[in-house]
Amino acid sequence: MSRNQDVFPILDLQELVICLQSCDFALATQENISRPTSDYMVTLYKQIIENFMGISVESLLNSSNQETGDGHLQEENENIYLDTLNVLVLNKICFKFFENIGVQDFNMTDLYKPEAQRTQRLLSAVVNYARFREERMFDCNSFILQMESLLGQLRSKFDDYNLIQQQLKQYEDVDGDNIPDEQELQKLEEQNKELEIQLKKLTKIQETLSIDYNDYKISKQSIFKDLEALSFQIVELESNRDKLIKISNTDMEELSEGIKELNDLLIQRKKTLDDLTAQQKNLQDTVTTFETIISELYDVLRIISSEVQESNRTETELVGLKQNLINNKLKLMNVLETGIMYKLEILQEQLDLQLKNLEKLSQDTKEESRLNDTKLMDLQIKYENEIKPKIDKTDIFIQEELISGKINKLNDEIKQLQKDFEVEVKEIEIEYSLLSGHINKYMNEMLEYMQ
């Protein structure tokens, strides 16, 4: 298994050292792990194996040496042989241990030439296993207590057996004729083998329960992740639905109010234009009247001057009067043109601009309203045809598939596992009672035989 496929997190050096020291591995320091040596890693792995598996490499080698004897070894090769055998046994045990905790590629190089990154990865696997073991230890307390009780009873039976063996040996020393027959000894050995088989079965049951519980936990986490993803989708769809409802309920009213205000403003500006037009017409009529009066006065004066012609003084006065009248006319025209006409032109331009803006705004409003209606209709159709079926389908899927299906299935599997476990426990209790009966029967027979 490659590093990217590991089922456990790779810890940094500081956290790794803290976790290992909390597990009573005092040798674990940042300096030793960052620059590992062969002797250091061999010593640390021996402590890990002895702590988690209860196996001592030295004790295995000592027992093996006692069984095989050292006579076949030469004196100069004995130390080399023992060191090599020590590393081989440690490598085999470490390979099996790391394989059980999720590392498939442990090899001899990790003992002879350890690398910092691989060492950090292997020790991270050990910490992850220790955490999982500590978390699951509470679930296995009842099994551990039962196993300890059975082991205590088994040790008691072995002690009884050893006591009987000692008594038999004493009787053999006293009287060589009182030797148990071979059939009874063979029967006793078979019973011991049955006890060992029962112990192995209990160990396998414990491992199977741990694996089943881990699978159940993984399945539960996967279902929770699916439910979380579906919840996010539902929240997003509900948010989009609320936005569509807000657009359909709010924007049309605001547009209608805006159009109404603009229409009122247009009516007001038209009324102002009509008033100004009427004032302009009145002023034009006044100017026309003044022009008529001036023309008539000029004609009268001209007739008078042509009829009288008495003196140049009178003519000069008439010319001056005419000039004054002309000046007054020009002044009046200038006043009209520069005052009221200028204001009328400004108001006319403003009115034309407002009319153009109003017309453009009305067109834009109509176009925007049409686009909003079209978009709202499309969104409504899309919601009805796509989003709502998905929401309904999601609700049905959550209700039927996840809640009613997978969770019920997992509950059924858990109940079935509990039933199977209870059946196996009952079978073990029955076998244990039978075994106890056989041992008691054997003890009674041995006592009767010795008496």
From Swiss-Prot:
Its main location: nucleus. Present with 1550 molecules/cell in log phase SD medium. Residues 153-291, 341-371, 398-432 form a coiled coil. Belongs to the NUF2 family. It comes from Saccharomyces cerevisiae (strain ATCC 204508 / S288c) (Baker's yeast). Pfam families: Nuf2. Component of the NDC80 complex, which consists of TID3/NDC80, NUF2, SPC24 and SPC25. The NDC80 complex is formed by two subcomplexes, TID3/NDC80-NUF2 and SPC24-SPC25, which are joined end-to-end through their coiled-coil domains. It has a rod-like structure with a length of 570 Angstroms and globular domains at either end. The TID3/NDC80-NUF2 globular domains are probably directed to microtubules, the SPC24-SPC25 globular domains to the centromere. Acts as a component of the essential kinetochore-associated NDC80 complex, which is involved in chromosome segregation and spindle checkpoint activity. It comes from the Eukaryota. The gene is NUF2. It is found in: Nucleus; Chromosome, Centromere, Kinetochore. This is Kinetochore protein NUF2. One of its GO terms (cellular component) is Ndc80 complex.
